[in-house]
């Protein structure tokens, strides 16, 4: 499933989490990650959200897959771009994570003889590269353990968000009501 978490839609605060958008009950939109839209005076003027359109009425499993997919992608984005070490933004791509891990492991195995090692950590707000040279085993170990702790916290936050997500509003709209008289 491809979802662009950076492509948000907007609307009124009264928008439902799911709705049929045609009279034939054949096209549905499901929404998640509602965020307030504020004006210059910090007054809420609407909401933004991520939505997916289905050419049919989606099942609850499809809704859960969509919502969990959004949470997973937001968690990945937070890991990738949210880590700051010593006031320096650090790009935690999978490749960089492997490189940092390997450099720390080799430095540990060689008791620091493999140092110094220089890494491009990320970029500043103007797009200029930010480099750091690790010269001691203690410094690279502190950096690496901080990065691992950050990644673990992001993953735990994502799991907690999924565990606590309330699907009741979706179920009320998408689950047929049965009359057991």
Language-model regions, residue ranges each:
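A preference for well-ordered globular domain cores
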Residues: 2-181
